[in-house]
């Protein structure tokens, strides 16, 4: 049975108040832009969002923050969003900061059905407070728990009608593990082809992890920090 939905608006209806939402992407790279816009427009609220970051003030997950749809954020980097800062300091937003490697492994573990694992990352810091500690080989480790979500949203370069996904270069980032960790996973793809057209050796995420696919072919490609080099002797950026 095909998994292609008619639009991101149809997909957004699968997300409900109070859901835990896992979002792929890294900064603004590889984020499911159209799905995020549709979630904003739908107005669902009290979300717990799990992502590497929370976008910027006017793009990405920052749009959901600005609309006050996020109750809790589980992330590893939040420094690019002034709205995030204001909501956190005013007590509107609950925040759980997780080291980036630990966050990736918590999502991967959740998707693999692993309830928890031990890591040395964060031992002796506030990150480890209140968590179980154990010693292995003379070194202290802290217990971290796997993360799963009610819905995961990811961005793919290509998808087929059965939900098999190919990501492109650095836009792969958190997307493959996010796709594994949702009870329902929705993939926004730049191109959708018929089942069997993708080379099996090129598939990054098998369709077994993906329940729905939507086409998102015309996204705005934003850059968080643009750095250019002056052309030698001309004073012009290149």
From Swiss-Prot:
Which InterPro entries does the UniProt record give? 3-oxoacid_CoA-transf_A, CoA_trans_fam_I, CoA_transf_BS, NagB/RpiA_transferase-like
Query: What UniProt keywords are attached to this protein's entry?
Result: Transferase
The enzyme's main class, written as a single word, is: transferase
Its family?
Belongs to the 3-oxoacid CoA-transferase subunit A family.
Q: How does it assemble?
A: Heterodimer of a subunit A and a subunit B.
* Top-level taxonomy: Bacteria, Bacillati, Bacillota, Bacilli, Bacillales
Catalyses which reaction(s) = a 3-oxo acid + succinyl-CoA = a 3-oxoacyl-CoA + succinate
What PROSITE patterns does the entry give? COA_TRANSF_1
- The residues listed in the UniProt record as binding CoA, with positions renumbered to this chain, are 24-30
Q: Which GO terms describe its molecular function?
A: succinyl-CoA:3-oxo-acid CoA-transferase activity
What protein am I looking at?
Probable succinyl-CoA:3-ketoacid coenzyme A transferase subunit A
Its EC number is: 2.8.3.5
């Amino acid at each position: 049975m095909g998994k292609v939905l008619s639009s991101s608006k149809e997909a957004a209806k699968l997300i409900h108040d109070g859901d835990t939402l896992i979002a792929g992407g890294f900064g603004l790279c590889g984020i499911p832009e159209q799905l995020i816009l549709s979630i904003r427009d739908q107005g669902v609220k009290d979300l717990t969002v799990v992502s590497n970051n929370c976008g910027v003030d006017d793009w990405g997950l920052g749009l959901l923050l600005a609309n006050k749809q996020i109750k809790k954020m589980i992330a590893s980097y939040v420094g690019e969003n002034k709205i995030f800062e204001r909501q956190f300091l005013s007590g509107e937003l609950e925040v759980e900061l997780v080291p980036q490697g630990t966050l990736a492994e918590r999502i991967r573990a959740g998707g693999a059905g692993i309830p928890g694992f031990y890591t040395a990352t964060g031992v002796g810091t506030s990150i480890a407070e209140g968590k179980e500690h154990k010693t292995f080989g003379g070194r202290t480790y802290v217990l971290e728990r796997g993360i799963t979500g009610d819905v995961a949203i990811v961005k793919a370069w290509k998808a087929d009608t059965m939900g098999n996904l190919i990501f492109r270069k650095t836009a792969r980032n958190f997307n493959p593990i996010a796709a594994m960790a949702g009870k329902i996973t929705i993939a926004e793809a730049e191109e959708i082809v018929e089942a069997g057209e993708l080379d099996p050796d090129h598939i990054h995420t098998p369709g077994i992890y993906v329940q729905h696919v939507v086409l998102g072919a015309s996204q705005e490609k934003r850059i968080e920090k643009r750095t250019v080099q002056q052309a030698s002797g001309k004073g012009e950026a290149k």
